[in-house]
């Protein structure tokens, strides 16, 4: 039996603590100085960056080549909420695939899919480890976050495929061109995760109408089907599409990072998670960090977070414009709906439904429908200082949780994701019946995301490296002198790397593992802070030459589309 009153054994996985830190068991001596990295944001990008920085350090890639006593790394993640709460990532649809809306393959889509799947599998193992089967009581389990969770949720992610119906005639033309008229298996060399097939209306109806027509007591509305001839004429199916419970994934990813840091404590690795809202880049820059990575979504455009010149630099390097988008999604809950196991037939699982309106069955009994969105103005570099800002609270204000809002979202769901409602014959007349109703709504979720400039190949997240080093004024060595305030201070410049991951948009789940790898590699390349020494002002002039002579650079690590 566990002793719950033992306060000496602190649970490092308790999300209720403000700071969670994993470090070596010995007291660090003064001769060992870690690379100190701050990451602002605990969404897909922020946690992926933290994980990859720690992984690289465990392989010795952050150890200085100039001084053997300067090794190890400390990663501190700052977030206003616990991992899995707040921000766009925590309410992401969780639809993992590597195809554009017209069926073509996204650049770096296959490798992004593979890297994300690898992290998902690790996080699933972490979650399984943290569930104590002896504590299962009446369908609930006690998990690492200290909360009671429903066992019926199933696994964190499921490979059920993703279906993209054509919703317009233009969609149908593009899908036929990219999928039907392309021999995807011409040489029999297509990788399993790349498999895609063209589907006709009949197969789409099997997936979209199967449950609605079972036990609903009515025939389909023929007139409604005629109206949907174009919308449901064809589509494509991504064989290895995955639906992910984004909130659970983020929770487990944070614990995976803690495990990784603890496992590599001998390499002088430590990790801290601080529940704290960072008000500005300057606030963090004035602390003792050697590198700063901003992965804070729309917060980066909040008034005062960046100074005007840095904000202009962000816009220019991110492609010229950024757009904030506030939105809401319905979280649906319904038994025996998204997964069915009938005695007479095999198990059936609804695939993820792609499109401008999506449906993601992220648990056995839960799905997310969305997004209903409101785009902010596209902001150009010259207007960067006046950039508008959407917070989650602003999204809630724009889209209040009212009966009118719920009714609107239900109409969108029943009309745009599902074909027209069934018609039920009553004794007096025909009565329309929608598949989903207000009783199926669990909650309304809100979020804000940042979109970048659209290119012919689509939108891509951006990794921005800022140019300006941080200047600090150190105390005089003679501060102990009675007249120390009259003595000249030593002004020096600590060259800090500041990176920002922005414009993640709707591609966070697909690309976040790759983004984390690139950010970690960028922190290693041109290791200006490798020896952690204070650099004299005049030495900063030589930084450009040092970068030009480096074998690896930010430009060679991060592909052009992502910078």
What are these model-derived regions, one by one?
Residues 93-212:
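Dinucleotide-binding Rossmann-like beta1-alpha1 core, especially the glycine-rich loop
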Residues 436-470, 474-563:
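C-terminal catalytic lobe of FAD-dependent flavoproteins
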Residues 48, 286-411, 415-442, 454:
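Flavin-dependent oxidoreductases
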Residues 54-89:
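Glycine-rich FAD pyrophosphate-binding loop
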Residues 233-279, 284-285, 289-291, 295-296:
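Helical element adjacent to the flavin cofactor pocket in flavoenzyme catalytic cores
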Residues 29-45:
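Beta1/beta-strand and adjacent pyrophosphate-binding region of the FAD-binding site
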Residues 45, 83, 299:
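Conserved Rossmann-like nucleotide-cofactor binding loop
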Residues 103-116, 170-171, 236-252, 401, ...:
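Short beta-strand to alpha-helix junction loop
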């Amino acid at each position: 039996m566990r002793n719950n009153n033992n306060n000496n054994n602190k649970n490092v996985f308790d999300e209720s603590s403000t700071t969670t830190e994993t470090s070596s068991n010995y007291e660090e001596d003064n001769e060992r100085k870690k690379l100190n990295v701050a990451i602002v944001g605990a969404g897909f990008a922020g946690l992926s960056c933290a994980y990859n920085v720690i992984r690289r350090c465990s392989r010795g890639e952050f150890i200085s080549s100039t001084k053997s006593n300067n090794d190890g790394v400390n990663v501190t993640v700052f977030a206003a909420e616990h991992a899995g709460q707040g921000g766009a990532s925590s309410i992401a649809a969780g639809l993992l695939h590597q195809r554009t809306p017209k069926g073509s393959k996204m650049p770096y889509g296959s490798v992004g899919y593979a890297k994300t799947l690898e992290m998902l599998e690790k996080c699933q193992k972490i979650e399984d480890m943290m569930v104590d089967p002896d504590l299962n009581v009446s369908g609930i389990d006690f998990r690492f976050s200290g909360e009671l969770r429903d066992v019926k949720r199933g696994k964190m992610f499921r490979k059920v495929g993703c279906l993209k119906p054509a919703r317009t005639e233009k969609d149908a033309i593009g899908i036929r061109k990219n999928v039907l008229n392309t021999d995807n298996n011409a040489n029999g060399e297509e990788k399993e995760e790349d498999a895609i097939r063209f589907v006709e209306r009949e197969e789409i109806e099997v997936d979209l109408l199967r449950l609605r027509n079972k036990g609903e007591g009515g025939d389909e509305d023929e007139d409604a089907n005629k109206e949907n001839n174009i919308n449901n004429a064809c589509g494509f199916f991504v064989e290895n599409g995955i639906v992910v419970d984004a909130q659970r994934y983020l929770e487990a990813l944070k614990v995976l990072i803690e495990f990784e840091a603890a496992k590599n404590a001998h390499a002088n690795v430590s990790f801290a998670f601080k529940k704290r809202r960072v008000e500005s880049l300057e606030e963090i820059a004035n602390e003792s960090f050697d590198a700063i990575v901003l992965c804070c979504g729309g917060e980066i455009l909040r008034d005062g977070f960046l100074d005007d010149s840095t904000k202009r630099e962000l816009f220019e390097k991110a492609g010229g414009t950024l757009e904030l988008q506030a939105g809401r999604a319905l979280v649906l809950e319904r038994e025996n709906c998204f997964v069915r196991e009938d005695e007479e037939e095999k198990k059936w699982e609804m695939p993820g439904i792609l499109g401008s309106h999506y449906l993601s069955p992220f648990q056995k009994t839960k799905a997310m429908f969305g997004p209903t969105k409101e785009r902010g103005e596209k902001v150009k570099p010259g207007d960067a200082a006046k950039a508008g800002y959407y917070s989650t609270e602003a999204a809630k204000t724009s889209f209040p949780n009212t009966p009118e809002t719920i009714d609107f979202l239900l109409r969108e769901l029943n009309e745009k994701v599902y074909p027209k409602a069934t018609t039920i014959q009553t004794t007096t007349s025909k009565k329309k019946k929608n598949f989903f109703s207000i009783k199926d709504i669990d909650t309304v979720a809100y979020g804000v995301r940042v979109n970048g400039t659209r290119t012919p190949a689509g939108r891509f997240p951006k990794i921005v490296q800022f140019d300006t080093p941080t200047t600090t004024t150190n105390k005089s060595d003679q501060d102990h002198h009675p007249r120390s305030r009259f003595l000249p201070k030593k002004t020096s410049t600590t060259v800090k790397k500041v990176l920002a991951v922005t414009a993640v948009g709707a591609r966070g789940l697909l690309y976040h593992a790759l983004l984390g790898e690139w950010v970690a590699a960028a922190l290693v390349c041109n290791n200006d802070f490798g020896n952690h020494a204070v650099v004299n002002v005049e030495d900063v002039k030589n930084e450009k030459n040092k970068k030009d002579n480096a074998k690896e650079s930010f430009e060679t690590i991060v592909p052009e589309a992502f910078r």
